[in-house]
């Protein structure tokens, strides 16, 4: 059943225009899964059109009420959102962390001076280096003339 589900999911992704993404497991934790920055940008841009998505990914914790009335709380692993973290940045509004084997990835929505930047950092060497890598990009944005134009 999972194989049939994954086949249909991959067909759906292809039909939606995510032509360079292939998933082998519903969890996404398969080292053979493939995607590209282009597909990550496309799906993120599409989801960011939804306010409910922005609300969820910008929080360090999110509690959902399930159909049976019970609740489930998720803790966001993006330490840019954690006010107790050395990496906390009030201008980061999500989006997704991910890691497989020795690759640490991070997709970030950064808001500064009324502008939004979608940053996809793939293949960092450690959990902390993914935040250092993105911080370097954020610093470059902050110091550029682009924000004053």
What are these regions (language model features)?
Residues 1-149:
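Penicillin-recognizing serine hydrolase domain
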